[in-house]
Amino acid sequence: MEQKNLNINQASGSKINTELAVPIFQSRRRHRPRQGLKRKKGFKRDDDSGGSSESSNEDMRDNIPIVSGRKKTVRLNRLQRESEQFENSALKDINVEYQSNLSATGESVNTTTVSAINEDTREVILGRPSPKLANQSTLPTELFQSQNDYSRFLPKRKDFEKKSQVGPVLSSNASTVRMNTIIDYQPDVCKDYKLTGYCGYGDTCKFLHMREDYKAGWQLDREWDSVQEKYKKGAKLEEGMVKNEKKEDIPFVCLICKKDYRSPIATTCGHHFCEQCAITRYRKTPTCIQCGADTKGLFSVDKNFDRLLKNRKSKNDEAVKQKVGGFESNNSATTEVSERKDREASFQGFADTLAKPNTSAQQKMPSLGDNSNTIISKYFIREITESNIVHFKRLVRVVLEASYSDKFYRLVLKNPDYARIATFEDKFVGAISSLVAEDNSLYVTVLCVLAPYRCLGIGSLLIDHVKKTAINNNIDRISLHVQTTNESVIKWYTAHGFKIVKQINDFYRRLENKSAFYMVCPLSAHNNIISNH
């Protein structure tokens, strides 16, 4: 209603009532205080007049306009924008091209018109270093020069060989670093350092750097054992007995001549022979007849050997006084040769009784571990096994002076029925081995007896065992080869039923006499005799 009245009054030209007017609020923009916009005092120059007062300076600062830090943006109208775009498009239409093959050199440049302030600028323009005059001297060292000129005065680092560097190499920056190295040395001496005095590992080598000689453990043990042998109970050697050598190991005759020792000598392997016999054998072969080792022609006189023979002879004389064959021998002066004849006679008497049927029980010696042992007094034969194959090899090498391959000894072990080894007082003195051929015959490959134990019936015992085994296996004959010059062996085989069939030349390739007799023994004629055995 009031608004309607107001409109009516205005239309009628009446005076407007101020009490009914609408209030209008307008926020006034606040300005920054003028005192905070005062400039700082500038740097006072010397030429400024000192009479000017501070009031005049303040009036001048008031007249300086204040520049705002905000960038003022100016808006362009349409005409200005079109003119600016036209100028930019005109610049784009203008295309400037150039081409150069860079073939110009410094010599083609006209040097007469080139002037430079210093030598460096001239070298850049001309493209070549400027020649120095002969009388031009270098600058004194007191003047300042460029860094390149000073670098040539620095001393060069001397070259060093890398081989001379041993051990851990530290960097130059680690001069203040302290290092403790602990090396666990092995109980061995460095071989390189001991021989040459130089080791590539240096201080890091785990072996000891010593050049002295030290005894190994086994050497110390050997010396200790040799000292302790003197204090062992019952270890005292007999007077005249060689150290570490039993009395039974020395044959009572020379193995080469089969006679008593004459001027006995000892070889490097510890065996004794006659001096003349050893020299004669060395001319043919350098091996020892007893062990097969190389003597190298070195023989020495054993001073205790004669005394040892006398001690053994005295003990044998005492043994002869005992009962032999039911009677006591009162001959105290019996020699070793007579003793051997007595043993041969006793063994021959036992062999004669063996040919006749005997109903009395035979007393046997205790066996040494083999099941099928033939016991005959002190002599008996065993099967060849892995435990005694070494003794079989030694007999073949010493008696026959032959060396067979391992394949041959494996064949001997595969045919245990036709291979035996004879022993005397636990010593291996003889052996025999045979192989079955394809024509149902038996071929004797080895038959050997040591020289001191021959003519005692050991060889006959071995060949009779092979014959008996062959007859039980229905084998017709036994064959073998004998050297034509070995008359005693040919006579022995003939006495045991062998006959010469033919002669073969060049049978033994490594012997001087290479011819051999091929001998055969038929088993049909020996059936009755062997069966009684």
UniProtKB/Swiss-Prot annotation:
GO BP annotation list: mRNA cis splicing, via spliceosome; snoRNA splicing
Cleavable signal peptide: none
Record keywords, A-Z: DNA-binding, Metal-binding, mRNA processing, mRNA splicing, Nucleus, Spliceosome, Zinc, Zinc-finger
Gene Ontology MF terms: DNA binding; N-acetyltransferase activity; ubiquitin protein ligase activity; zinc ion binding
Zinc finger (RING-type): 254-292
Segments of skewed composition (Basic residues): 27-43
Localization, UniProt: Nucleus
S-S pairs: none
Functional summary from the UniProt entry: Involved in mRNA splicing.
Subunit structure: Belongs to the 40S cdc5-associated complex (or cwf complex), a spliceosome sub-complex reminiscent of a late-stage spliceosome composed of the U2, U5 and U6 snRNAs and at least brr2, cdc5, cwf2/prp3, cwf3/syf1, cwf4/syf3, cwf5/ecm2, spp42/cwf6, cwf7/spf27, cwf8, cwf9, cwf10, cwf11, cwf12, prp45/cwf13, cwf14, cwf15, cwf16, cwf17, cwf18, cwf19, cwf20, cwf21, cwf22, cwf23, cwf24, cwf25, cwf26, cyp7/cwf27, cwf28, cwf29/ist3, lea1, msl1, prp5/cwf1, prp10, prp12/sap130, prp17, prp22, sap61, sap62, sap114, sap145, slu7, smb1, smd1, smd3, smf1, smg1 and syf2.
UniProt protein name: Pre-mRNA-splicing factor cwf24
